[in-house]
Structures are given as C-alpha cells and as structure tokens.
C-alpha cells in the first residue's frame, strides 16, 4: 500500500508537469537555458522572442565552471567544445607599460572544479541552445512574438502580444533582460539607472594579429580597462573596453562608435593593446551604456517570475551575468519539479537564488571599482576564483 501511494504521488507530479503550460518571455541565454532544462524535465514550454530572426550578432562571453557544469548536464558539452576556447590563464597588466601584475591560472579548472572555464562567441552558445531545444521540443521557440503585457488571472496568466494575439499560460517566466517590460509592469516601475560606465566592444580576426597578441589579458588603469580573449576556435579575438562617463543618453546595445574616437579614448594604453583594438573586423566597434537597477527583494507575483537580468542585473566585471542566469534556469526548474504549486516553487527559488545573486551583484560592482582604479597588485586582491566556481546548481540544496 505504501508503494502504491508513493507511486501515485509520483505519477501525479509527472502529469502536473506534462499539463502545465509554461511561457518564457525572452530568447536569450537565460530564457533558452530555462526552456531546455524544463523540457528535459518534462514540462511543456513555449519561448516567445520579440526578434523576428536571431543572427550572429554579439561578441564574446565567459563561462566559468559554475555555468558550464549546468550546460554540460543539459547535454551541451560537445556543442560548446566544438567552438569554445579554454584559456590557460588570464594576465592582468598595467595599462601603460603592459607589465604583468597578476595571473589567474585557468588551465586546471576542469580538474579542480569538475567543469571547464570557456570563452566563446555568444552566438555560438545561443545557437547550440536553439539547436538542442529544437531537438527536444520542436516548435517551442516562437520568433517575432513581442509580449506587450501579462495579466495574472484565476490560476492562469494571459499574455497580450504586439499584434493583438492572446495566449494563456499556467506560468510565465520573464527572461527579457534588464529592460524587462514585465518587471516594469508588475514589480518595480523605476527605470534602469546609468552606472557611470560606458563599454565598447569589437572582434578582431586573429589572422590580422601577431601571434603573441592573441591571448587572454586585461589591461587596466587611468579609469579605464580593456579585456581581450580568444573565441570561436581561436579564429577571433573579442575585446571589451570600459571607461567612466558622467552621463549617457543614447539608446541601444549596438550603437556604432567611430573608430578614431574610440582609439583616442584609450590612447594611453600600451602598444600591444592599442594594436589589438585598432584592427576590429570591418572597422566596426559598438558602444553601450552599462545600466543597473535597485535590488528587488521579490522576484515573483502570482504565477509570474523573473529570471536573469530581469531579476538581478549585474555589471560585467565579475564575468558572472550569464552564469547567474544559467544557475537561475536550473534552480527554477528543480523548484517547479519539487513543489506542489508554482507559487511554492517561486518562493523556494527566491530563497535559494536570492542570497547568491545578491552577493554576485555586489562583488561585480566592487570589481568594477578595482579594475578602473590604480593598476597595482593590491587592487586585484580577492580576484582569485572562489566558491562561486565550485557551486553546482544541479545538486545544490534548495532553500
């Protein structure tokens, strides 16, 4: 009798998953990872992405072991290793002289943490997620689907799209980024706040560079820093440069920046760094303002929940923004599997993820101050990888 009761409860959980309609708003890394994790767990998922087409845009991304551990668990290991670069180390250097101040050794991270430290083109990760999702749940990704608003109702949520279409779901997961319209409507009306940092990015064909410049390095000082590293099997070198600004009024993530103005901004850097940033593919450099939001104590309202940058945006200096969204995806999936109702699952998700995401957000801000401060060894104390890399969202305790 005991076995029969236990079996009945288990089957009820399975049926609940199969019958629960989950809508994910946003087809970025966080949304797609969530979709893949949830479809593999047996949930019925639809991803609504506003873009009519997803293309090979964007630049590089760092995936530390806490992120790759989740992605490998989801079966993406071969896809990532086909294009990613595993750097042996990253050197932190004086902006003007190029002298090495600190080395972060990454070549042994797979052995130490049980998962690798990877650098890759953002599109390569996104494409791998799209491909795997299509294999697991054909038709789950709906492009050209711009959600105007969500309205929680009696046990379901209604989604209204820009074209007037209506859909309903049992759960809505907002993975629509720092400018999340769902967060604006249901959680916190305050707009994103400019943090005082502006970033530029570009890609360089490594065939156009001397071999000794094709490396992972961070040059910093003079209120600026430039991070560069190889992606796409070493065929491209990605760079991201950051400087202080008092204000920012432009809109968008892909604002073309005049190359001469960009080079003038970083003219005080060492010759090797200047050579790298002077040779972007097709002379293209893009800029954007770095924004933040006040910390949000509650990430859910009824059957609507926030994930990734929509919940806890962070500055890029820790290299953990995408990793935290990936962790969110796995933890939220586990919570929905374990709890009887979405509301209970969201409360457990908040208790599990809130403290860790808050710590990462705070540390990212502190590292920004260090990286754009004085270039010395003291400014890099605490940069050694720690508990954040050892974290395992696949098996960590919930709650």
Give the predicted meaning of each segment.
Residues 23, 27-52, 173-174, 200, ...:
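Conserved mid-domain beta->alpha element of the FAD-binding
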Residues 10, 14-18, 22, 39, ...:
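Conserved N-terminal helical subregion
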Residues 23, 46, 140, 238-240:
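A structural signal for isolated positions on well-ordered beta-strands in alpha/beta enzyme cores
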Residues 252-287:
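Flavin-binding catalytic cores
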Residues 215-249, 263-268, 290:
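Active-site substrate-recognition segment that forms the wall
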Residues 78, 206-212, 339:
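Short helix-loop capping/hinge motifs at secondary-structure junctions, enriched
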Residues 53-69:
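Conserved N-terminal glycine-rich FAD pyrophosphate-binding loop of Rossmann-like flavoproteins
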Residues 3-4, 10-21, 97, 278, ...:
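Helical substrate-recognition/capping region of FAD-dependent monooxygenase/halogenase enzymes
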